[in-house]
Amino acid sequence: VMRVPFTSGILIGIGETRRERIESLLALRASHRRHGHIQEIIVQNFKAKPDTNMAGAPEPELNELLWTIAIARIIFGSDMSIQAPPNLSPGVLPQIVNAGINDWGGVSPLTPDYVNPEAPWPHLDKLARETRVAGKFLEQRLTLYPRYVQDYPRWLDAGLHSQLLSMVDGV
């Protein structure tokens, strides 16, 4: 049986408590420990959108985003990729990296953020600069993480393995 690695995460700032965030992250960790299927955890801050029921809702403060990223890193450890969308927190990207993310996610110079089209992706050069400020570097990757390519019998059709292997750095 082929399995599907995927992304999961939590949306913060919608009325939940810190305890509820921890409980949600612990539930995701328990699921991942059972199935090994979560490639990355996204910690996404709520952004109010016009013409929605939550248009007037307050957005979470930066310290709440940073706290939640740090807790996610503690809960999942260094083996899990932790993401936060860079287009939703302009001007504080080094702080987000320092809180514990190691991946910006699907940033694209070609397509908009379909979930938050009002918040354009940062230019890749700017994102690379701000990532360097935090002592890290920006690197392009496939949507499938190297560890899943390495364990291809479990996660991939065998016919795709050699092609993907040639595209994955460090495998």
Sequence positions of predicted segments:
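Radical SAM/AdoMet-radical enzyme domain recognition
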Residues: 1-8
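A generic short-segment signal for beta-strand/edge and adjacent turn/coil regions
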Residues: 10-13, 73-75
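Glycine-rich beta-alpha junction loops
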Residues: 12-15, 45-47
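Auxiliary Fe-S-binding modules of radical SAM enzymes
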Residues: 22-171
